[in-house]
């Protein structure tokens, strides 16, 4: 834009001076030639300044990230990790999650269930325990290896979809496709020109909210942690898709500990046990249908979620 504007300005000014007799036609042609010669260097300079500005902004952001200090650290002398199939418990709410079961937590206040998910996964200050050992007394790497939090705002990054779903690159295609099936994301994959080798745009902008949620769920299932905690994993999908996910999730996580924060009847009807959270405390536990019949507060919370559909 600016180089072109320079040529227009020089031509106009030169023509005006030539008409007034202050510039000869030969001088005008020569001056125009000089201006045209400067167009390419000027354009290159402008582009370089723009790229330098963007680079400086990006560098400052990277530096800010690199300077961040993690809020959580491993203790100086970590406690011994409990064995597999350990019970997960949160004294603050009274929730106890039996090992190997699919447990749901229902709360009328989403912030309460999200806070519980953060405590159970040691992404916030907590006195939660695994096998009777406080999470914050275990080595942080051990906790991250054994417990995975799938939060409400899934994030996708730029790159190939295969690398997005399987960052380690250790998983074969058959296992990846099985996880995609469990997350009911086959239609998302089918719509991509190169399927698993398709490029994902920044933040997954080419996908809808429901598609991003299912791809992130696929990634969580492929991680295959001992304990998977999911905060509203189906909030952005339609009822038919949610029902398929609920059915397949149970099979995909069979024998492993899974906690789902949700108010969806479609999911609740397929879990082993439901815990009702009121005011941040567990006030009732049991099968979905029993709580639906016996507990008015539970019935009101779940029915409201059903009406939202």
Give residue ranges: language-model regions.
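Hydrophobic alpha-helical segments in the permease module
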Residues: 2-3, 25-47
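Primarily ABC-family ATPase nucleotide-binding module
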Residues: 66-109, 251-254
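Conserved signature/switch motifs of ABC ATPase nucleotide-binding domains
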Residues: 223, 229-230, 235, 254
């Amino acid at each position: 834009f600016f180089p072109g504007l320079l040529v227009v300005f020089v031509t106009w000014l030169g023509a005006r001076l030539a008409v007034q007799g202050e510039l000869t036609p030969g001088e005008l042609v020569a001056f125009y030639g000089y201006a045209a010669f400067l167009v390419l260097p000027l354009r290159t300079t402008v582009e370089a300044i723009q790229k330098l500005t963007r680079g400086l902004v990006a560098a400052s952001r990277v530096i800010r990230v690199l300077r961040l200090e993690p809020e959580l650290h491993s203790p100086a002398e970590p406690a011994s990790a409990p064995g597999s199939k350990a019970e997960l418990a949160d004294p603050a709410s009274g929730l106890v999650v039996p090992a190997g079961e699919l447990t749901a937590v229902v709360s009328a206040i989403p912030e309460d269930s999200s806070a519980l998910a953060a405590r159970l996964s040691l992404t916030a200050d907590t006195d939660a325990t695994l096998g009777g050992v406080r999470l914050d007394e275990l080595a942080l790497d051990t906790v991250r290896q054994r417990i995975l939090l799938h939060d409400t705002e899934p994030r996708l990054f730029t790159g190939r979809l295969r690398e997005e779903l399987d960052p380690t690159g250790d998983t074969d295609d058959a296992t990846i496709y099985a996880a995609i099936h469990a997350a009911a994301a086959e239609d998302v994959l089918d719509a991509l020109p190169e399927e698993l080798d398709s490029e994902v745009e920044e933040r997954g902008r080419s996908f809808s909210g429901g598609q991003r949620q299912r791809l992130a769920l696929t990634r969580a299932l492929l991680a295959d942690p001992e304990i998977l905690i999911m905060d509203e994993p189906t909030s952005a999908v339609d009822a038919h898709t949610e029902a398929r996910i609920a059915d397949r999730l149970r099979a995909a996580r069979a024998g492993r500990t899974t906690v789902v924060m949700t108010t969806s009847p479609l999911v609740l009807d397929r879990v082993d046990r439901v815990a009702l959270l009121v005011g941040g405390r567990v006030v009732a536990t049991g099968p979905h249908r029993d709580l639906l019949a016996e507990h008015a507060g539970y019935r009101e919370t779940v029915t409201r979620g059903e009406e939202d559909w």
